[in-house]
Amino acid sequence: KVSRFNQRSRYCLAESYYRNDEFDAARSLFTELYNVSAMYGEKESSLIPYNIAYCFYKERNYPSAVKWFSEYLDQPSVKYRKEALERKADCHFISKQYRMAAETYSLVMTDYMNADDVYPYYQAGLSYGLDNQSDKKIEALSNVLNASPEAQFYPEALFELGRAYTLKDDDENAFGCFRKLAD
């Protein structure tokens, strides 16, 4: 019989592998711990699917990362829900599943609305644009108008909003976006 001390040590070893960019070794150990429910009852137990997902994400195996982020998000209480949703959406985006990406970024926008957290609505806007949904692209990117100009991704999002307005022949709003960027 394997002791709890042994299982927790193996969990920490998997984390060490991850931090040393040895994602395959980390994933293998996390998966083994998950499959045998070795950490059941421990606070780290609920993080195992999240850790497996991140290993796949770092290995650029996006379909598997989506599966494991979903597994993590399906738990009743998750500590890193926003982060998991964003990475899941990123996986969809990278895999050119733009509609699914947009829907997942929109969940982040709805559940964690913060005007200065431009990333989810910038990415949602890009996703809608690549899915030929220009009105939804404008709607998502319009949130940047409430953000601080110092917010990360502010200039990129405002530029994309200006481009979206230009493509819709809305020259007045496009001008407003580009003017803000130029000032």
Give short role names for the model-derived ranges.
Residues 1-183:
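Acidic, polar-rich low-complexity tracts and alpha-helical solenoid repeat scaffolds
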